[in-house]
Amino acid sequence: GDLHELFRRLVDIESVSMHEAPIADAVEETLAPHRHLEVTRLGNSVVARTHLGRSERVVIAGHLDTVPVVENLPSYIEQRSDGDYLVGRGTCDMKGGIAVALALAVSLENPVRDVTWAFYECEEIAAEHNGLEKIASWRPDLIDGDFAILMEPTDGRVEGGCQGTMRFTLE
């Protein structure tokens, strides 16, 4: 389907943290008919994988949840001097990335690398609820890869990054 239509449909699904079932259902229903993908659901996280025997695997991931809704559902189109904008909860963080990943997952049947598409719950809240962490704990094989891309918004730039802590003692 049309990427803009998919994007708007996803934005119009309320998916506040801990209440992602409707959007996880929509993601699963979008992916399931495509025979080139093995689709697995864990809670309200959905993982789709190709199995083409490629030498490398790329993991492309994004979270399904949003912060609470504040009178911004349903979405609407706002006309500005530089173009039309979809306005609504999650348009930037991160349903735009989810829409792009979903569109690619269903259309990219023969990629040069195997691909894992991970759509996970509960990123916007405390780490103990994080769906990506749960997938890594329950089924690490599902997100094993050689390289990963997180579809978080970056103002249109590719950014390298990592998450971690450093502990030291000053004497």
Q: Where do the protein language model's features map onto the residues?
A:
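N-terminal helical capping/dimerization or prosegment-like subdomains
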Residues: G1-V59, L64-V69
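Acidic active-site catalytic centers that drive phospho-/nucleotidyl reactions
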Residues: E5-L6, D65, D93, E123-E124, ...
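A generic secondary-structure signal marking the coil-to-beta-strand transition
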Residues: R9, N44-V46, R54-V58, D84, ...
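Short, contiguous, pocket-lining structural segments
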Residues: H19, I23, D93, V158, ...
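General beta-strand structural signal in soluble alpha/beta enzymes
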Residues: T40-L42, V87-G88, W117, I149-M151
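Active-site metal-coordination/substrate-binding segment of hydrolases
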Residues: R57-F119, G131
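Acidic/histidine-rich catalytic neighborhood of metal-dependent amide-processing enzymes
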Residues: I98-R167
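The feature captures the short pre-catalytic strand/loop hairpin that immediately precedes
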Residues: T169-E171
